[in-house]
Regions:
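Beta-strand-rich domains and repeat architectures in extracellular enzymes and scaffolds
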Residues: 25-61, 198-203
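Short loop/turn segments that connect beta-strands within beta-propeller blades
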Residues: 67-71, 114-118, 182-186, 234-238, ...
Length: 669
């Protein structure tokens, strides 16, 4: 049954104060909360606050703690001079674990600090750092995920200096292993029974029993993400029991207990497919009670998974373990996010509450009656909220109060139908201080990445391609949610398989036409932009119409065949593009779906932005497109950001992107 209780209030706003100008610095130098977690006793919430401005313009972070009921103001536990993240509570609620790169920049180690502050205690000095960790319920052990330490660092440096640093593909590839750290002795024991599998997640059974471990065959995303397996590990003996393969993009293993049986649920792509919506899949481990691990031993024969979300018109985004009850989950629901709890009797999720915009980072008390999470609405940036499940929640953090004096563009929710009748949604941000009746305006269409992603009714201000950044400069901004994205169930998402640039393109164009017909958009001043898959769509659009007067292609794909062969998500990219180059001489589906194939038809000026060290969408995609545009004499600007990956981290580069995109539109619109 649908429940429309609002967890986080959002009042409609049409006017704003105008005492402050939105600068690129105010966008980039923002503090953002991350990773809230409720203490075992249910009284406190710990979280990290990350901000730019560290050494080299890279982010730094600090650990904060606040009362769940908001009775006392949050306080900072660490000084924030390093990158301190990922807080997790000790079993007695007396201290907080976290990761810190204080000793070596970009090398995370495990640390601990008392809830009342004081000096933080370093717990590891693992060469190469740790990838993740999980404090166990015995209070004496921490499960740590880390690569092997390897040989002497000076020997490695010597080999590099002599040129003896060759890389043989697939040989000696580092994998993250499961290790158990004894907090008293500081001894580390590696669980050898997992072999050379790459461990990506671990969750302990709430009664202090075995660990659920999710692993890949290799640390490489391709084929790692397609070769996930679940295991159950006894932390005492180190014994490993195999539960077998799980689906594409498997994540978030959680335990729950019902009727004498332990269940182990996780999230993966629905129906065993490569492309589609995520689903919650559940298995029963046969045992008479919670006290032993023979459940996993019996499960070695065969494990069956039941799809608990089959037929739901929403998409799970987070699945959260509750110590004394069934799991909670967040679901993307169109432009909103809803909170659900699993009903143990029906094995279906019951909707508890809904909030406009985005909810994330869900954490729950032992009973599941209290929760904390991150929430962002149309005019409020992401902050930590806490309170009873179902709401109302109290805002604990307030990381960007200065933004309340900025005049924002009014953000409207849109709903319309595609040319084939498919219901669609999206957002429109009007120019700051302007109303619909003052149009038409120059319109920038910003396409989201993924494609399995969405725009929600949240605060749209980020360093890459920001809706409100453009709205404060006088542009209307259209944020479409075309088919292939999340928030509308599995079938909606699965339409992208082998068909990128098809239905999603006509969905976007239909929204643009609607805004022109309504008098909002000026048909002579249209632009399109996006990052990642959005960058692909921008490149695709200008190869199929001359209606756009400017385009921005950020970290976008120009050639799906090349992307399948060189991108780190190759197996998924091959499914999106529809084929690979090694399937024969062609013709290939991926050529039909690639913007590079239509470069001769492009007349629109293009700004190409790309990180030099991008492994998700390698730089070659941008170079390929740049050379094609140069060949055909198309006006364009090609910008490469040194040291950057798929998302830009350095402050100077983020500032450049914001200013350069605005300048590009000012020039052409």
């Amino acid at each position: 049954m649908r429940n429309d209780v609002r967890m986080v209030d959002q009042e409609p706003q049409t006017t704003f104060p105008s005492s402050a100008e939105l600068t690129a610095e105010s966008v980039v130098d923002a503090a953002a909360p991350m990773g809230p977690v409720i203490s075992p006793d249910g009284r406190l919430v710990a979280y990290a606050v990350v901000a730019n401005g560290g050494e080299g313009g890279r982010p730094r972070g600090a650990i904060w703690v606040g009362a769940v009921d908001g009775s006392t103001a949050p306080r900072r536990l660490t000084d924030g001079t390093a990158r301190e993240l990922a807080p997790k509570w000790a079993a007695d609620s007396g201290s907080v674990f976290f990761t810190s790169d204080r000793e070596e920049r970009d090398t995370a180690q495990l640390a601990r600090i008392g809830v009342n502050g004081g000096e933080a205690e370093a717990l590891t000095s693992w060469r190469g750092g740790i990838a993740d960790y999980c404090p166990l319920f015995d209070g004496r052990t921490v499960a740590v995920l880390a690569e092997d330490e390897g040989g002497d660092e000076r020997q490695d440096e010597g080999r590099d200096a002599e040129g003896d640093d060759v890389k043989v593909w697939g040989r000696h590839l580092p994998v993250t292993r499961l290790r158990l750290l004894d907090l008293d002795s500081r001894e580390v024991r590696t669980v050898e029974g997992l072999g050379d599998r790459h461990v990506v997640e671990v969750a302990q059974r709430p009664d202090g029993g075995p660990l659920a471990v999710l692993s890949w065959s290799t640390a490489e995303l391709d084929p790692g993400v397609a070769t996930a397996e679940l295991h159950v590990v006894d932390p005492g003996s180190g014994a490993v029991y195999e539960l077998g393969p799980v689906g594409m993009e498997a994540q978030s293993p959680v335990w729950w207990y019902d009727g004498g049986l332990w269940h182990l649920a996780h999230v993966a792509v629905s129906g065993g497919q490569v492309i589609g919506g995520l689903a919650v899949l559940d298995s029963v481990l046969p045992t008479a009670g919670p006290q032993t691990t023979e459940a996993a031993e019996a499960a070695e024969a065969a494990v069956e998974y039941r799809d608990l979300t089959a037929g739901m018109p929403v998409c799970p985004t987070e699945l959260v373990q509750v110590a004394d009850g069934p799991p909670l989950a967040l679901f993307a629901d169109g432009l909103d996010t809803a909170l659900y709890r699993l009903d143990p009797e029906s094995l279906r999720f019951d909707r508890l509450a809904c909030a406009p915009g985005t909810l994330s980072g869900l954490t729950a008390s032992r009973s599941g009656g209290t929760c904390a999470l991150l929430a962002s609405t149309a005019y409020e940036p992401e902050n930590v909220h806490a309170g009873p499940v179902g709401g109302p929640l109290v805002r604990l953090s307030d990381t960007r109060p200065e933004l309340r004096t900025v005049r924002w563009g009014v953000q409207e929710r849109l709903s319309y139908r595609a040319s084939d009748g498919l219901p669609l949604d999206g957002l429109l941000i009007l120019p700051a201080g302007r109303g619909r009746d003052e149009g038409p305006f120059p319109l920038v269409t910003m396409v989201h990445g993924g494609p399995y992603f969405r725009y929600s009714d949240e605060f749209n201000l980020n360093p890459m391609d920001s809706g409100q950044w453009l709205a404060t400069a006088g542009y209307a901004v259209f944020l479409p949610n075309p088919r292939g994205g999340s928030g509308h169930g599995h079938a909606f998402a699965a339409t992208a398989a082998g068909a990128v640039g098809g239905g999603e393109w006509t969905d976007i164009l239909g929204g643009v036409d609607l805004l022109i017909a309504q008098g909002v958009a000026d048909p002579e001043r249209l632009a399109i932009s996006g990052w990642s898959h959005g960058g692909f769509m921008a490149a695709w659009a200008i190869g199929h119409t001359d209606r756009f007067k400017a385009a921005v292609m950020g970290a976008g794909i120009s050639d799906w065949g090349m992307q399948a062969g060189t991108g780190e998500w190759g197996v998924i990219d091959a499914a999106l593009g529809g084929s690979t180059g090694w399937e024969g001489p062609g013709p290939h589906v991926h050529d039909r779906n690639s913007p590079i194939s239509y470069a001769s038809q492009i007349r629109t000026p293009v700004l190409i932005l790309h990180g030099e060290q991008d492994t998700n969408v390698p730089l070659g995609q941008a170079i390929h497109f740049h050379r094609a545009l140069r060949h055909f004499g198309v006006e364009h600007e090609f910008v490469v950001y040194p040291r950057e990956g798929h998302w830009l981290r350095e402050r100077g580069h983020q500032l450049d992107v914001l200013r350069r995109i605005r300048a590009w539109y000012e020039r052409w619109l």
